[in-house]
């Protein structure tokens, strides 16, 4: 069985609720980035051992939370050893705004996965204005 980890930051609890549902659906281990943007050593080890990593962050001002960005920067240690090379990645975000530039956050998550040599998996959904999407 594949080992999946959901790593997320939640500022007000909304992203945590989504992360819990994603983890339940994927039978994944749930790892929360703390309020200072840190993870414990056991959490980093779990990420290294995972077959798939799912990122989660709220979108604030058109990007990921600073705590998630701190985690992303700290992941450079894994980058140097290519610890996440060829892992499968996905991600999610939310914001209080109907638009809120969540797309920019998702591109950032995809870029982070690509920096690590990962394989990004999208939802495969067509734009909602397409007749094929209904």
Task: Spell out what each predicted region is.
Residues 88-134:
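Short, glycine-/small-residue-rich phosphate/pyrophosphate-handling segment
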Residues 1-84:
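N-terminal beta1-alpha1-beta2 submodule of the flavodoxin-like/Rossmannoid cofactor-binding fold
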